[in-house]
Amino acid sequence: MSFHLSTKERLLLLIDDIEMIAKELIEQAHQKISSTELVDLLDLLVAKDEEFRKMLELAEEQAKVEEAMDQLRAKVEVHDREIQKLQKSLKDAELILSTAIFQARQKLASINQANKRPVSSEELIKYAHRISSANAVSAPLTWCIGDLRRPYPTDIEMRNGLLGKSEQNINGGTVTHQNSGMPSEQQRTLSGSAGSGSGSGAGGEVPNAFQNQFNWNLGELHMTMGASGNTVALETRAQDDVEVMSTDSSSSSSSDSQ
């Protein structure tokens, strides 16, 4: 029956037995008893003492085993935490992969739908113009919810912006009429036509008929027509167009004078 008890309980029972035997020996020492009874009590005490020592050795072994088990439990807890971290990482990866697969399936479905029902680029451009005419993609930095202004710049704000000012500076810049700004071939053509039209004039000198035919103003070119002095405004959109027009006018004037 003692085998079903724990080591602690068995040790406590042995201590109780040794205590009872010791009390019996002390009581019998004051009384006259036979030597055989005394020897039996002593033998029983020695047997209980040996059993108690064996139980102590067993308890020490069990304590060592318990210490090893505690170390193993600590290692198990460490590995358990690592496993939990890995499990969490796997769950996150599973969530990301499932989301990516879902989005990929949606994209494949949209691609298949687009292949079945293609849309021309003209319709896309029309749709983009329709969106741009009614909506916008950005708002001013100071705009907030409840602001009465539109969340996109107006035409006046666009003209007052940096792009509008830069365009005004380009279109409204001062244009000077210099021979150095013309290509060398056109300068030679203009000089040759002027020399042939002057006749008796000095070589290389521009005649009076060709002087003051071009008046250059800001962003505008005026050409004098004949002796009447009427001027016609010409657009100065590109420097090449102005140079070609000046060369053609010089050639026509020289042919008229001849």
Swiss-Prot record:
Where is it chiefly localized? Answer: nucleus
Q: Where is the composition biased (Gly residues)?
A: 194-204
| Low complexity composition-biased segments | 246-258
Q: Name one GO cellular component term.
A: core mediator complex
- The region called Disordered is annotated at 164-208, 234-258
Does the record carry Ion transport as a key word?
Answer: no
> GO biological process: what's one of them?
regulation of transcription by RNA polymerase II
Lineage: superkingdom: Eukaryota
Q: One of this protein's Pfam families, by short name?
A: Med4
* Compositionally biased tracts (Polar residues): 166-190
Q: Could you cite one Gene Ontology molecular function of this protein?
A: transcription coregulator activity
Keyword line: Activator, Coiled coil, Nucleus, Transcription, Transcription regulation
Q: Which InterPro entries match?
A: Mediator_Med4
**Recorded coiled-coil stretches:** 52-101
Its annotated compartments are: Nucleus
What family name appears in the similarity comment? Belongs to the Mediator complex subunit 4 family.
Function statement? Component of the Mediator complex, a coactivator involved in the regulated transcription of nearly all RNA polymerase II-dependent genes. Mediator functions as a bridge to convey information from gene-specific regulatory proteins to the basal RNA polymerase II transcription machinery. Mediator is recruited to promoters by direct interactions with regulatory proteins and serves as a scaffold for the assembly of a functional preinitiation complex with RNA polymerase II and the general transcription factors. Required for activated transcription of the MtnA, MtnB and MtnD genes.
What quaternary structure, including any partners, is listed in this protein's UniProt entry?
Component of the Mediator complex, which includes at least MED4, MED6, MED14, MED17, MED18, MED20, MED21, MED23, MED24, MED27, MED30 and MED31. Interacts with MED10 and MED21.
Q: What is this protein called?
A: Mediator of RNA polymerase II transcription subunit 4
Q: What organism is the protein native to?
A: Drosophila melanogaster
